[in-house]
């Protein structure tokens, strides 16, 4: 693992994607690694960078596997934070629904440190959005 690339990716996630500032609060929701989906080191790396490097008010919540009512517990505390980053499958349950809180939500599909250090994860999020918008414009303006 290259620490420089890791820091670039962490900054990309927290500053470019989440648009967090020093006075913001962050809840990191991490699925217990015993379920095999997410490596625990990913959420710990984000927590440490957010808290120590960016000075954010940061909390880490470890959750179990998704269940039909598991989102209810999280919904109760989401409004206490400016942003919630999910390293947990539970964050994907409401992908197409209207959010029930004003908290900014980010569902991360990065499952380990290696994928966080990938060229995709370290590429500037804002520039990737410009690229996506350009592609969408071409597609949506096509004649057939």
Walk through the language-model features, giving the residues of each:
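Active-site bordering "gate/hinge" segments
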Residues: 1-144
């Amino acid at each position: 693992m290259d620490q420089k690339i890791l820091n670039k990716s962490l900054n990309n996630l927290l500053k470019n994607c989440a648009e967090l500032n020093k006075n913001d609060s962050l809840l990191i929701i991490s699925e217990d690694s015993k379920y095999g989906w997410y490596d625990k080191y990913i959420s710990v790396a984000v927590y440490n960078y957010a808290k120590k490097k960016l000075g954010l008010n940061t909390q880490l919540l470890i959750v179990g596997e998704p269940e039909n009512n598991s989102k209810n517990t999280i919904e109760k505390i989401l409004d206490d934070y400016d942003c919630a980053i999910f390293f947990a499958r539970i964050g994907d349950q409401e992908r197409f629904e209207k959010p029930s809180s004003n908290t900014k939500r980010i569902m991360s599909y990065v499952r380990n440190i290696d994928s966080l250090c990938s060229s995709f994860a370290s590429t500037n999020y804002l520039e990737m959005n410009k690229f996506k918008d350009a592609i969408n414009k071409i597609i949506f303006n096509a004649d057939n």
